[in-house]
Structures are given as structure tokens and as C-alpha cells.
Amino acid sequence: MPRWGRGRRRKMRMIEFIPYARHFYPALPRFGPPKPPIIMTYEEFEALRLVDYEGLTQEEAGKRMGVSRGTIWRALTSARKKVAQMLVEGRELIILPQGNEVIKSDEE
């Protein structure tokens, strides 16, 4: 049986909130050649929202998303770095799905 890709399959992430605005760009254009946009995944956005906006612990956020605390830590670290990079460098930020997300409905 052929294997697609390397390593283990990525576990599905439970996402409760899809952002209304998914594309952010600086009001004033940069001087010089434009830098490529920064891409943030729904997983990173959800980790940032749960921990920094809702005030959950990483353990609680992991349970809500159906992943380990370590996975939340990695997603959160990556999301924070991308937001800081966007602000400091004046770059675009685009939030996109990665393909391994499951949207949680209110009934669950």
C-alpha cells in the first residue's frame, strides 16, 4: 500500500471560529520591493484566539481543539511570531485553512 507524504498523518483540529476578516495589509505601502505575505493557518489562529483572547490555558485550549498541549504551544508560538512579524515589517497577513480542520457546530 503506497504512503502519501512523510511521517504520521496530521490529526484533525477542531475549529470553533472562522475569522470574518482573513486578509490584513498595511494602510501605507512599504518603500522598496514588496515582501511576500505571511500565511497563518486556521489552527494557529484558533490557538491564538483561545489562549490570548479567551484566556484559556494551553491545556484547556488543547482539549477544545482535540490536540495535545504541545501542539497548542507550537501553533501559538508560530502565530505570535507571525503577528509580530506583520506589525514590525509592515507585511500582509493572510489566514487560510490547511485542510485538516473540522468546524465545530454549536450543537456539539
UniProtKB/Swiss-Prot annotation:
InterPro entries: RNA_pol_sigma_r3/r4-like, UPF0251, WH-like_DNA-bd_sf. Gene3D superfamilies: Winged helix-like DNA-binding domain superfamily/Winged helix DNA-binding domain. It comes from the Archaea. Belongs to the UPF0251 family. It holds the Pfam family DUF134. HAMAP family: UPF0251 (MF_00674). This is UPF0251 protein PF0620.
